[in-house]
Amino acid sequence: MDFSKMGELLNQVQEKAKNIELELANREFSAKSGAGLVKVSANGKGEIIDVSIDDSLLEDKESLQILLISAINDVLAMVAQNRSSMANDVLGGFGGMKL
């Protein structure tokens, strides 16, 4: 086992991880529920950055809660899928390297 190659590989992985974090911060995902009455947006880090609620829901608290939960769960699932895909892309590139 060549430890110098392992160190080089580790540096490459760390550099790619930094690049992914920067890219994730700049990505935006949105999900709608209730035929678009509620829209939630999140960045690639999973931080909610915007919520839009149609005025017609303001007097129906229960429906608003249900639609918010649905939109939040959907957008967070999108973020998780994207993060997983990006991580697989990075780690997949190192699978064939012989140490």
From Swiss-Prot:
Per the record, what is one GO cellular component? bacterial nucleoid
Matching entries from InterPro entries are given as: YbaB-like_sf, YbaB/EbfC
Upper lineage is:
Bacteria, Pseudomonadati, Campylobacterota, Epsilonproteobacteria, Campylobacterales
Recorded GO molecular functions are: DNA binding
Q: How does it assemble?
A: Homodimer.
Keyword check for DNA-binding: yes
Give one Pfam hit by family name: YbaB_DNA_bd
Name of this protein: Nucleoid-associated protein Cj1642
Asked if the Swiss-Prot or TrEMBL record annotates the protein with the keyword DNA-binding, the reply is yes
Assigned protein family: Belongs to the YbaB/EbfC family.
Q: What exactly does this protein do?
A: Binds to DNA and alters its conformation. May be involved in regulation of gene expression, nucleoid organization and DNA protection.
| Subcellular localization | Cytoplasm, Nucleoid
Which keywords does UniProt give here?
Answer: Cytoplasm, DNA-binding
Primary site of residence:
cytoplasm
